[in-house]
Amino acid sequence: MGQFISFMQEIPIFLQEALNIALVAVSLICIVKGLVNLYRCGLFQLMVFLVLAGRSCSEETFKIGMHTQFQEVSLSLSALLTNQSHELPMLCLANKTHLYLKSGRSSFKINIDSVTVLTRSADVFVHSPKLGSCFESDEEWVVAWWIEAIGHRWDQDPGLLCRNKTKTEGKLIQINISRADGNVHYGWRLKNGLDHIYRGREEPCFEGEQCLIKIQPEDWPTDCKADHTNTFRFLSRSQKSIAVGRTLKAFFSWSLTDPLGNEAPGGYCLEKWMLVASELKCFGNTAIAKCNQNHDSEFCDMLRLFDYNKNAIKTLNEETKTRVNVLSHTINALISDNLLMKNKIRELMSVPYCNYTRFWYVNHTLSGQHSLPRCWMIRNNSYLNSSEFRNEWILESDFLISEMLSKEYSERQGRTPITLVDICFWSTVFFTSTLFLHLIGFPTHEHIRGEGCPLPHRLNSMGGCRCGKYLPLKKPTIWHRRH
């Protein structure tokens, strides 16, 4: 699995090679052609016929020639119930007795019992949807909306009691829905409203007893999930109030932001910096690496000489000129004694020698690669003509080209993954195998000789349907390859 993941990650890289592109093309052609051969040989059709034919005699099992499909779609409106300040309310019924309401960042718990908490003498009496003295502004509208949804009419029904929001006991509103005396019709109407928006709730109050609804802020329980069907029931109960006092906001709005959440209407800008290289010819790490491997070269001695002198001058910049000269002479003595002696003997014998001044190398103009510089020999105080050491620089050029080809071959081998070669090999084997299957061919179904295909039914030896839908015709059957 790891090899496959690595192979997929390297696709943009190895497609830069022509050989890799050819391998990919051959693999794709073999795979596609192999699948076509498998389809044309009839093997798939025969397997489908043997597995499915005769399972059912219904006319609806297979529809030959029909291009319609039975499909379904499921809608989830939970995305609309987002955590915005003006969202559609969510309702929840937990354990059939605990009622909850949530809208925006405010959530409430609705309790129904017979315990009186608020009194008219000590608390606020309200008879309008303006609940500013009881709740905050972002809570006031949703509580008033919920009260109207269960059937309360502000201009006709009794007033409500609520605790002043400045008190430390907490926010609370109390509604009397007792079905007794003159309150019976009002109580039944609000009970029916609760039953409509909270389907399946259990009624804790009995006929003739005191029954109070208490609404107070509380955290939304974790076991309550967003259910848009309850929201639809809530909206259907308060259709008139929605049209007048509510506007749905920001359901399908979007904006571009950066990773920190700041608005970025213009999107992102991509800046690309480029480095400009000079035309200076440099002998880079390749030449240094060769010098580290092979020390018997005048050019490498000069590199070491320059390096030592540079470091000495940098370190002893404030030293006297005499100390610098002494140190320079000492460092220059590090040049290979063997080469110095050899060049001196050559000079005495009038044999070409090196004076560490002029060097030659073979440069490849297309790739910019070059050989390791070699000393240009001197004889009789004059440099040799290039034709005098023609064999040397021709041989050096051969070495350079061989080195370049070897390096290029190694790089190409490295850029051709083994997985790609395996895919190409096995796809070719797959194509060859399916080619033989296509030449052989398989029968795809059975039907009565000389008559049409009775798909999807499977026939017996008497020419009848095995499931009993059609009577035996006592006609011979034959296997056919195509319809």
Swiss-Prot record:
Q: Which family does it belong to?
A: Belongs to the arenaviridae GPC protein family.
Q: Which residues are glycosylated?
A: N83, N95, N164, N176, N355, N363, N380, N385
Per the record, what ranges lie on the membrane's Extracellular side?
2-17, 54-58, 59-422
Domain description: The cytoplasmic domain of GP2 plays a role in ER location. It also contains a zinc-binding domain that allows SSP retention in the GPC complex by accepting a cysteine from SSP as the fourth ligand.
User: Could you tell me the superkingdom of the organism this chain comes from?
Assistant: Viruses
Which pairs of Cys residues are joined through disulfide bonds in the record? C92-C224, C134-C162, C205-C211, C269-C282, C291-C300, C354-C375
Species of the source: Tacaribe virus (strain TRVL 11598) (TCRV)
- Which amino acids does the record list as binding Zn(2+) 1? C57, H457, C465, C467
Q: Name one GO cellular component term.
A: viral envelope
- The name this protein carries in UniProt is Pre-glycoprotein polyprotein GP complex
List positions binding Zn(2+) 2. H445, H447, C453, H483
Single GO MF annotation: metal ion binding
